[in-house]
Amino acid sequence: MEALIASTSFFVPISNSSSSHIINNRFFPSFYSPNLNFGTFRKTSLSSSHLVFSSSAISAPPSSTVLTRNSYWMVLLDKPPHWVSSKSAMVDYYVEILAKVLGNEKDAQVSIYDASFDTHFGFCCHIDEDASRQLASLPGVVSIRPEQDYSSEKKNYGIGSHKGVSLFDHGTVKHWMVRIDKPGVGIVTKAQMVDHCVQLLSKVLWNEKDAQMCLYHVSWQSDFGFCCDLDERSAVELAGVPGVLAVVPDNSFESLNKDYEGDSTQDSRDQDDSESPPVKTKKLFITGLSFYTSEKTLRAAFEGFGELVEVKIIMDKISKRSKGYAFLEYTTEEAAGTALKEMNGKIINGWMIVVDVAKTKPFRQNRSQPSFGL
């Protein structure tokens, strides 16, 4: 099921003269539409808010250009910071985001050919698949998806309110049932199983948020698997992901009782998480954190369950930014067990976190001792 939200676009006419440009007052007319189509653009020497339109609006790639699969992409973003208010400032903001992947603003300016400023925030760009993967991992990027009809004047930036969003070409999406291997011992709750399935699916979709939106069912206690909306090409790719046993059509899409093992026995996947056996631990491992969540915020969220010995968010040594996961340690196992049960799947700074038992490091004494094996 797809949710399509139509939105109008303002298409800038193409001049036949290679030297003619459209200056700022025409680039952003008073009757502007939330979406703006443009070709390559650059800043003039007048000011950073004055943009110049080049005469090469995207309509079809040159015959000499060899395009890789999926070269045109639609990028959806979180709402820009409040100080990015004007339309020209938003374009600069979009360019800065893309420049983090391409390496410089000039290439980013040339690659962007459409932008949306109002209800939905984002842009369309012409980049290769490797760059699209890097772009999908940047903070503030909600999703990135191929845009097949890149020459269309009307762009649909809406992601909808349903899980079956328009990540794929219209009419190509099908419902699939995915059977997977039994997860590791650390996955003991439904929220952890959801996170595990998202990780598998994101190997195909490249973006965890897109993977979350495509999921619509998870089985996690007896039969292991999930159901999702994909096109056939993505389904074939998913079947080759390690840990995936089979990808078959979901012939019982309307039913909540899914037959992951080929029989019709009633499973117990809807039992309460509290029936899971208690885990003895003082240390917890938190994943799914927003890159902007601080140790102070994390401590405030967890200290209500007991005294904390340590709160440590793991930082990237190069970028000095959070990697999105952290470790917590309580003074008692009871406090840690309660926090594990109550906080798993909760929302912190707009992101759903997954709380797990912190695993000890593997025993590696044999590296420093002689081997007595045959």
Curated annotation (Swiss-Prot):
Sample GO molecular function, one term: mRNA binding
Coiled-coil boundaries: none
BP GO terms, sorted: chloroplast mRNA modification; cytidine to uridine editing; mRNA processing; response to cold
Phenotype on disruption: No visible phenotype under normal growth conditions, but mutant plants exhibit severe editing defects in chloroplastic transcripts.
One Pfam family cited in the UniProt record for this chain: RRM_1
Keywords: Chloroplast, mRNA processing, Plastid, RNA-binding, Transit peptide
Subcellular location: Plastid, Chloroplast
Gene Ontology cellular-component terms listed: chloroplast
SUPFAM superfamilies: RNA-binding domain, RBD
Keyword Transcription regulation: no
Bias type Basic and acidic residues, positions: 258-271
Quaternary structure annotation from Swiss-Prot or TrEMBL: Interacts with PCMP-H51/CRR28 and PCMP-H12/OTP82. Interacts with MORF8/RIP1, MORF2/RIP2 and VAR3/OZ1.
Protein name as it appears in the record: Organelle RRM domain-containing protein 1, chloroplastic
Organism of derivation: Arabidopsis thaliana
The gene coding this protein: ORRM1
